[in-house]
From Swiss-Prot:
A GO term for molecular function: structural constituent of ribosome
Subunit text: Part of the 30S ribosomal subunit.
Family the entry assigns: Belongs to the chloroplast-specific ribosomal protein cS23 family.
InterPro entries assigned: PSRP-3/Ycf65_sf, Ribosomal_PSRP3/Ycf65
Location of the protein in the cell: Plastid, Chloroplast
Pfam families reported in the protein's UniProt record: PSRP-3_Ycf65 (PF04839)
Name of the protein described by the UniProt record: Small ribosomal subunit protein cS23
Main location: plastid
GO CC, one annotated term: ribonucleoprotein complex
GO biological process: translation
Record organism: Pyropia yezoensis
Length: 102
């Protein structure tokens, strides 16, 4: 699934050995502005925390929230199933429109 509204938002993922942390930035002009803090998985329930954060911002369209949460699910599932075995570079190749750091 491709994020269609990448011109509005981008996911950022901190790729760690025992956790991942996911945040959303808003695209503003040629740069980005943090929209959320980082939410950790599996230390905390990053998906639920991110969902609550997005729902607290009524100006974000429902379809945008759904797309961002679906992509978050894909990243979490990848990390759980395969990612712990793979490098940051492989994760970036798997999700080229998401920013990975580690």
């Amino acid at each position: 699934m491709e994020i269609k509204n990448l011109s509005k938002f981008t996911l950022k993922v901190l790729w760690l050995e025992n956790n991942i942390a996911i945040a959303i930035d808003q695209i503003v002009g040629n740069g980005t502005s943090p929209l959320t803090s980082y939410f950790f998985w599996p230390r905390n329930d990053a998906w639920e925390e991110l969902k609550a954060e997005l729902e607290s911002k009524p100006w974000i369209a429902e379809r945008d929230r759904i797309e961002l949460l679906n992509k978050t699910t894909e990243v979490i599932n990848y990390w759980q199933e395969e990612g712990k075995k793979h490098s940051l570079a492989k994760a970036q190749a798997r999700f080229p429109r998401i920013y990975f750091f580690g």
